[in-house]
Amino acid sequence: MQSADNLIWIDLEMTGLDVDSCKIIEIAAIITDKDLNIIAEAEPIAIHQSDEILNSMNEWCIKVHCETGLTQRVKDSKISTEAAEQQILEFIRKFVPYQSSPLCGNSIWQDRRFLAKYMPKIDEYCHYRMLDVTTLKLLNQYWGDGKGFEKKNTHKALDDIRESIAELKFYRQKLLSI
């Protein structure tokens, strides 16, 4: 059921960080309520990219995406960027009204840049505001005790979102008395 209080969490895995030359290879989404309880999860979608695109990845991406199995999933996938965008958009629309939720995640501006370029319908559907968990991590480093949330960093889109939600819960309890 749709609610303007629900939050849209998205994570992307890309072939690199340069929005002009790199591509999205995986997208996942989770919807939570405002108290960060998970309402629904969209299965992660591996997005097909050509061997030319995959071969242009830097060493870090090659290593990590190979270890997680994502590179092979991308090669095997028949799903285009446009089809993945449509699937995720349909998922989001079930739970969140148009432009009512900020885009939520860790270092979410980087994902937002890729969404704006390659999945503009999702970008437009989300409110222009963003809820970036990284901000609280940095505030804890600067003004808190510096003891942060321990992350596994699996670099799998759905796992990364779950971890971001858990991290926000951690910092909400630790830093915010609201």
Swiss-Prot record:
Record: active site: Y128
SUPFAM superfamilies reported for this sequence: Ribonuclease H-like (SSF53098)
Domain of life: Bacteria
Enzymatic class: hydrolase
Gene Ontology molecular function: 3'-5'-RNA exonuclease activity; nucleic acid binding
UniProt-recorded name of the protein: Oligoribonuclease
GO cellular component, one term: cytoplasm
Domain Exonuclease residues, every copy: 7-168
EC number per UniProt: 3.1.15.-
